[in-house]
């Protein structure tokens, strides 16, 4: 199990031009997830991009207690296992409690640590002990240096297979911005750097609802902008949530990318990545210039 994780990790580290973590935000039904997995795999295979399929079994930090959360861990893992077998795809999904890591590690190839929990040592250690690849999302409240420490917690628990993910920084109330400097600085964690190009455009609890209450909004129209920036900088991986009907998605509809435009966007990103030197350190010569 640990060997298969290391093999996948080694493949993702050298993926060119980048690897892709993609899928619908949450498991809505078995039929929907299987259909989405097939569609996304068909596109990624056509474009030659290594794909890890993503979907969550439980959205534990919804804005409202009345919001849809997903099928739960037991049922959700059964569905993700079917995706894995049916389409020969590695799986990434998130955990929220240390007690979930063992069961999730039996299905997922990558265990994702949510941004709000990126400093939780017990959770990081429990996830690391699964032997699977660990993808740590940078908290919206954190500087880039926190990711170096979080990655080190995973390594000290005996697991060298770790990645860090930029997903935006709080900018006042109910808004996030993406600081592209973090995509460079997070390399100090000495591991692959992933850019979450969808959640990073979320507007947390920024949408007022008719009849009172709030929900999270988002700036879907800026997803291409953030994606172009990320691949130009030279990230190792792109994380994005994709939906075939985003206006009716039960979770994070405003920041899910339409499936019908996925191939078009990825083609553009591949073209940008093919000409950038972002993965190479720019060597600056500060000696006095002479003609």
Swiss-Prot record:
Q: Which residues carry this modification: N-acetylalanine?
A: 2
Q: What is its main location?
A: cytoplasm
Give the EC number(s) listed in the UniProt record. 2.5.1.55
Q: Which UniProt keywords apply?
A: Acetylation, Cell wall biogenesis/degradation, Cytoplasm, Transferase
Q: Which Gene3D superfamilies match?
A: Aldolase class I
Under catalytic activity, the entry for this protein gives: D-arabinose 5-phosphate + phosphoenolpyruvate + H2O = 3-deoxy-alpha-D-manno-2-octulosonate-8-phosphate + phosphate
One Pfam family cited in the UniProt record for this chain: DAHP_synth_1
Organism superkingdom: Eukaryota
Q: Which GO terms describe its biological process?
A: monosaccharide biosynthetic process; pollen tube development; pollen tube growth; rhamnogalacturonan II biosynthetic process
Write out the GO cellular component annotations.
Answer: cytoplasm
Query: Molecular function terms in GO for this entry?
Result: 3-deoxy-8-phosphooctulonate synthase activity
Regarding tissue, the record states: Expressed in roots, apical meristem, emerging leaves, hydathodes of young leaves, styles of mature flowers and funicules of mature siliques.
Enumerate the subcellular locations listed in this protein's record, separating them with semicolons.
Answer: Cytoplasm
Summary of the function given for this chain in its UniProt record = Catalyzes the stereospecific condensation of D-arabinose 5-phosphate and phosphoenolpyruvate to form 3-deoxy-D-manno-octulosonate 8-phosphate (KDO-8-phosphate) and inorganic phosphate. Involved in the biosynthesis of 3-deoxy-D-manno-octulosonate (KDO) which is an indispensable component of rhamnogalacturonan II (RG-II), a structurally complex pectic polysaccharide of the primary cell wall. RG-II is essential for the cell wall integrity of rapidly growing tissues and pollen tube growth and elongation.
UniProt lists the family membership as follows: Belongs to the KdsA family.
Name of the protein this chain belongs to: 2-dehydro-3-deoxyphosphooctonate aldolase 2
Organism annotation: Arabidopsis thaliana (Mouse-ear cress)
